Amino acid sequence: MKIIAKKDLFINDEIRVREVRLVGLEGEQLGIKPLSEAQAIADAANVDLVLIQPQAVPPVAKIMDYGKFKFEFQKKQKEQRKKQSVVTVKEVRLSPVIDKGDFETKLRNGRKFLEKGNKVKVSIRFKGRMITHKEIGAKVLAEFAEATQDIAIIEQRAKMDGRQMFMQLAPISDKK
């Protein structure tokens, strides 16, 4: 199991260099020491010798409790994953000739998505000759944006993509 992504840490007998720049338990510099002496110091303190900078000249080794270090590192990564929020984009599909009741239902769903912290893509699909009346679709999108302006901001203005017009809304708390 790797604990640090792109590089492996060498510990104790895995270290294959002649001398190291030694860092103590509390982070103090102990100077450049032969590997055997550095391992003896680590053994005397009953902890591990970990090569933390193998590309440095001379390589940097630190005296530390490797098990504790690994545990703390994994704990820190777990906390970072918890804090990371996944933003999903939900879609609400409308029609240029949508009825008031249907519009209210779609609006309610869009508001629910926004309150949960999701972004909302509002799209209108033009069928047949409706494509000639793009202003009707733009009016419906503007009405939707106006009805959600208290909890959302327009992240992407209304634009055409083939036979579809869409805009994207983001929750206000997301932008603070």
Curated annotation (Swiss-Prot):
GO terms for molecular function: ribosome binding; translation initiation factor activity. Keywords: Cytoplasm, Initiation factor, Protein biosynthesis. Gene3D superfamilies: Translation initiation factor 3 (IF-3), C-terminal domain, Translation initiation factor 3 (IF-3), N-terminal domain. InterPro entries: T_IF-3_C_sf (IPR036788), T_IF-3_N_sf (IPR036787), Translation_initiation_fac3_CS (IPR019813), Translation_initiation_fac_3 (IPR001288), Translation_initiation_fac_3_C (IPR019815), Translation_initiation_fac_3_N (IPR019814). GO terms for biological process: ribosome disassembly. SUPFAM superfamilies: Translation initiation factor IF3, C-terminal domain, Translation initiation factor IF3, N-terminal domain. Its main location: cytoplasm. It is found in: Cytoplasm. GO terms for cellular component: cytosol; membrane. It holds the Pfam family IF3_N. IF-3 binds to the 30S ribosomal subunit and shifts the equilibrium between 70S ribosomes and their 50S and 30S subunits in favor of the free subunits, thus enhancing the availability of 30S subunits on which protein synthesis initiation begins. Monomer. Belongs to the IF-3 family. NCBIfam families: infC. This is Translation initiation factor IF-3. The gene is infC.
